[in-house]
From Swiss-Prot:
Gene3D superfamilies: Leucine Aminopeptidase, subunit E, domain 1 (3.40.220.10). PANTHER family: GANGLIOSIDE INDUCED DIFFERENTIATION ASSOCIATED PROTEIN 2-RELATED (PTHR11106), MACRO DOMAIN-CONTAINING PROTEIN (PTHR11106:SF27). Signal peptide: none annotated. This is Macro domain-containing protein DR_2288. The lineage of its organism: Bacteria, Thermotogati, Deinococcota, Deinococci, Deinococcales.
Length: 170
């Protein structure tokens, strides 16, 4: 299945690359990023330090380190926007973070990528507004990359239902 919605732990997915919702400094944090950094181990932070950061709406890729034991090859660090009311280019920046993550995955030979819901935690992006952007961006990318499979890994049943409704409306 090219696009799948699941409820679960993003750090335990059978995929080639796991996307983390990073901050611009790429230095690890709470939420999904903290989970991925803990699962990948301290070498992830050592690998990301020299990069120094990346702008909102972009992504960078590193080895998966300790996640490689589960078959994950890469961690893709996507920087989504902080929600500021929706009139500051947030939708374009969010789509860019998804698109750049997918591009990096394909460029590095990944056949499967797992995403969290980027920017909907501490960055405050409303889930019902983020879901259609995420799913439309992913589906658009998959049209030109049919061999790629994408798994949206959502934390909690409420988030899963929001994404299921958004997918049904696309």
């Amino acid at each position: 299945m090219p696009l799948e919605l699941v409820q679960g732990d993003i750090a335990h997915q059978p995929v080639d690359a796991v996307v983390t919702a990073a901050n611009k400094q790429l230095m690890g944090g709470g939420g999904v990023d903290g989970v991925i950094h803990r699962a990948a181990g301290p070498r992830l932070l050592q690998a990301i330090r020299p990069i120094g950061g990346t702008p909102t709406g972009t992504a960078v890729i590193t080895p998966a380190f300790d996640l490689e034991r589960q078959g994950v090859k890469y961690v893709i660090h996507a920087v989504g926007p902080i929600w500021r009311g929706g009139q500051h280019g947030e939708a374009e920046l969010l789509a860019g973070a998804y698109r750049e993550s997918l591009r990096l995955g394909v460029e590095n030979g990944c056949r499967s990528v797992a995403f969290p819901s980027i920017s909907t935690g501490v960055y405050g992006y409303p889930l019902d507004r983020a879901a259609p952007i995420a799913l439309a961006t992913i589906q658009d990318f998959l049209r030109s990359h049919p061999d790629l499979s994408v798994r949206m890994v959502l934390y909690g049943a409420d988030a899963l239902h929001v994404f299921e409704r958004a997918l049904a409306q696309l």
